[in-house]
A protein has these predicted regions:
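Proline-aspartate-enriched helix->loop->beta-strand connector
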Residues: 6, 56-61, 65-82, 96, ...
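Residues that mark the start of a beta-strand
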Residues: 6-11, 32, 97, 152-157, ...
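A short, structured surface patch at a secondary-structure boundary
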Residues: 12-72, 76-82, 190
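Short, structured coil segments at secondary-structure junctions
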Residues: 29, 94-95, 185-186, 246
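His/Asp/Glu-enriched short active-site or ligand-binding loop at hydrolase and phosphoryl-transfer sites
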Residues: 37, 175-198, 221, 247-254
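Extracytoplasmic substrate-binding proteins
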Residues: 87-167, 201, 252-321
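Pocket-lining segment of extracytoplasmic ligand-binding domains
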Residues: 177-178, 190-208, 213-227, 231, ...
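Active-site/pore-lining binding-face segments in mid-to-C-terminal subdomains
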Residues: 216-278
Length: 322
């Protein structure tokens, strides 16, 4: 623990958007941020709405040098745990406090937000936020818990990407949040137990997808709009024979400035949307746009009508191909 509350905070390393999202759940600590890291994954920057006073300024390099960190005179450095070796350990050796986070699973958010709350002197806010997450999770769990195993749909949740060539399909390891999304939403992840190690996304082929024959296929992307890839799949003659495509059950997971299918603060919206899509009869009053607006107001204090309209407009574009 720090002797004093942090006054100069910087966030560094790959996936810095995860740590930034978490820190911004504590509004009374936001003024301590010296400058923002890179938070635009390729589809826009939410922080132009959340922190306009910092969003247009200089950004901390993703992998700064020791000298660049020291020049910013931080009394706290936040980073993802997998980026600690090689930079965080050197900063620690120099006496600069470093707080690493995982936030790869729902339970990580509860535990680590409590740690972060103590660090910034606002444990009450940590309890408030974890309770808000739990409330939304409980609604999903209570709705789908009685669905028998044999009645649960087979689901493929895959990341789609392209670099000036054919589309690439990948799935997350069994132990990552994407797998939990499907399980907690009441589905059966078709890739579970396929031998993919916890070392990152694993590439899969079209033939493997066809062999799995999932009832639902949900696609997502971080650097590009997932809906653009969905449009491409719908035009692909090979995909026309996939039963899920014939049934209209190949869909893009929504987002706004970022896709919801990742461990950012908005991960809960992915879980809510997926469960309502799998079981519309269990969520007859579900309104995704209402859930998005209440999320931003409750979790990030964003109630400005114009800002919320921009977020909803982005959400609508993300699902327009569904």
């Amino acid at each position: 623990m720090l002797r004093d509350l942090p006054r100069r905070v910087i966030i560094i390393g790959k996936s810095a958007i995860v740590a930034t999202d978490a820190f911004l759940l504590f509004p009374d600590a936001v003024d301590a941020i010296v400058e923002l890291p890179k938070t635009d994954q390729g589809t826009g920057d939410l922080y132009s709405l959340l922190l306009p006073q910092l969003a247009d300024g200089a950004r901390t390099p993703e992998i700064p040098s020791i000298e660049e960190v020291v020049a910013r005179n931080p009394d706290l450095v936040l980073m993802k745990d997998f980026t600690y070796t090689g930079l965080g350990d050197k900063l620690t050796a120099m006496g600069i406090p470093v707080f690493t986070i995982s936030l790869e699973m729902p339970e990580d958010w509860n535990a680590e937000l409590r740690q972060l709350g103590k660090l910034v002197g606002d444990p009450g806010r940590a309890e408030e936020v974890t309770a808000l997450y739990q409330e939304r999770q409980d609604k999903v769990e209570q709705a789908v818990s009685d669905v028998p195993e044999q009645d649960r749909p087979k689901v493929l949740m895959m990341r789609v990407s392209s670099t000036d060539g054919p589309l690439t399909y990948t799935v997350a390891p069994d132990t990552w949040m994407q797998t939990r999304f499907v399980e907690d939403a009441g589905g059966i992840p078709v890739w579970l137990g396929s031998g993919f190690k916890n070392k990152g996304f694993a590439k899969i082929s079209f033939e493997q997808i066809a062999a799995w024959n999932p009832d639902y296929i949900y696609i997502y992307s971080y650097k590009d709009p997932a809906e653009d890839f969905l449009t491409q799949l719908k035009k692909d003659k090979r995909w026309a024979d996939i039963p899920a495509m014939k049934a209209g059950r190949v869909k893009a997971i929504p987002g706004d400035f970022s896709n919801y299918a990742q461990p950012i603060s908005r991960w809960i919206l992915c879980l809510q949307w997926m469960s309502a899509d799998l079981y519309p009869q269990l969520f007859p009053d579900f309104d995704m746009e209402r859930e998005i607006c209440s999320f931003y107001e409750d979790f990030h204090g964003l109630s400005d009508p114009q800002a919320q309209r921009e977020i909803i407009d982005r959400y609508r574009r993300s699902v327009q191909a569904n």
